[in-house]
Amino acid sequence: MDKQQGELRQRLTPEQYAVTQEAATERPFSGEYDNFYQEGIYVDVVSGQALFSSRDKYDAGCGWPSFTKPIDQTNLNEHRDESFGMHRTEVTSTQANSHLGHVFPDGPRDRGGLRYCINSAALKFIPVADLEKAGYGQYQSLFK
């Protein structure tokens, strides 16, 4: 194990590490942010990169936090994922290459038709009231 991975193992919970570094999936309906609707942004738990806004979150009923779009498409990479005999599109963050979840073409049509199905363990929530203090002041405008 290299030094960076060792530091991540110390900083992250076992579930956060398994999800972001080993592409694990948390159990449906078990994640902290599945049924969570405060206003703010969701960032990569590894790098802090801004990923999703609560304004784009919706209840897809799938058991994981679901979003119609990222804050900035350039903050995500998409990869073909054919593991477990399925044909899916994996979503990772660009800064830390953290596994986040998958994107599916079955989201609300009136909001672009995509469903970003994301593991809570890959995310950290920053409330609107804390955006400036936490270094994310540039995202205040998303909530005005």
UniProtKB/Swiss-Prot annotation:
Listed A to Z, the keywords are: Oxidoreductase
Q: Where is the MsrB domain?
A: 5-128
Q: Which Gene3D superfamilies match?
A: Peptide methionine sulfoxide reductase
* Enzyme class of the recorded protein, top EC level: oxidoreductase
Bias class Basic and acidic residues marks the residues at 1-12
- The source organism is Lactiplantibacillus plantarum (strain ATCC BAA-793 / NCIMB 8826 / WCFS1) (Lactobacillus plantarum)
The protein depicted here goes by the name Peptide methionine sulfoxide reductase MsrB
In which family does this protein belong, per the annotation?
Belongs to the MsrB Met sulfoxide reductase family.
> Under the GO molecular function aspect, what terms does this record hold?
peptide-methionine (R)-S-oxide reductase activity
GO CC annotation terms, alphabetical: cytoplasm
Active site per database record: 117
Please state the Enzyme Commission number of this protein: 1.8.4.12
The record's Gene Ontology biological-process terms are: protein repair; response to oxidative stress
Q: Which residue intervals make up region (Disordered)?
A: 1-25
Q: Which reaction does it catalyse?
A: L-methionyl-[protein] + [thioredoxin]-disulfide + H2O = L-methionyl-(R)-S-oxide-[protein] + [thioredoxin]-dithiol
Matching Pfam families: SelR
